[in-house]
Amino acid sequence: MTKSELIERLCAEQTHLSAKEIEDAVKDILEHMASTLESGDRIEIRGFGSFSLHYREPRVGRNPKTGDKVELEGKYVPHFKPGKELRERVNIG
């Protein structure tokens, strides 16, 4: 599901809200989540899961086109860990 598909579905279910209100709310939520992660904080949504940053160590990679070795710097990447209720709901484990 894309962001626009989510907005469309919410508009269909929440007929008392305008499409603009729903779009703004979705954008605000995603922006707050991104800025929270950007500041290094963890996000926990009970029953759904948690978002955090994981550090990837520097490593030597390869350019897939040329096969040349490339030094890759260490970096932080977003990580999602599903909560127990979500795992059970989608039957992951």
UniProtKB/Swiss-Prot annotation:
Gene3D superfamilies with a match to the protein in the record: IHF-like DNA-binding proteins (4.10.520.10)
Kindly state which keywords UniProt assigns to this record, in alphabetical order.
DNA recombination, DNA-binding, Transcription, Transcription regulation, Translation regulation
Query: Record's superkingdom?
Result: Bacteria
Q: Give one Pfam family.
A: Bac_DNA_binding
**Keyword Ubl conjugation part of the UniProt annotation:** no
One MF term in the entry's GO annotations: DNA binding
Which GO BP terms sit in this record? Answer: DNA recombination; regulation of DNA-templated transcription; regulation of translation
Q: For this UniProt entry, what's an example GO CC term?
A: cytosol
> Which CDD domains would you find in this protein's record?
IHF_B (cd13836)
Q: Tell me where the transmembrane regions lie.
A: none
Q: Which InterPro entries does the record match to this protein?
A: Hist_DNA-bd, Histone-like_DNA-bd_CS, IHF-like_DNA-bd_dom_sf, IHF_beta
| Statement: the UniProt record of this protein carries the keyword Signal | no
| Cited NCBIfam families | hip, PRK00199.1
Instruction: Please explain the role this protein plays, according to its UniProt record.
Output: This protein is one of the two subunits of integration host factor, a specific DNA-binding protein that functions in genetic recombination as well as in transcriptional and translational control.
How is the subunit organization of this protein annotated in UniProt?
Heterodimer of an alpha and a beta chain.
The UniProt family comment states:
Belongs to the bacterial histone-like protein family.
Instruction: Please report the name of this protein according to its UniProt entry.
Output: Integration host factor subunit beta
The protein's organism comes out as Vibrio vulnificus (strain CMCP6)
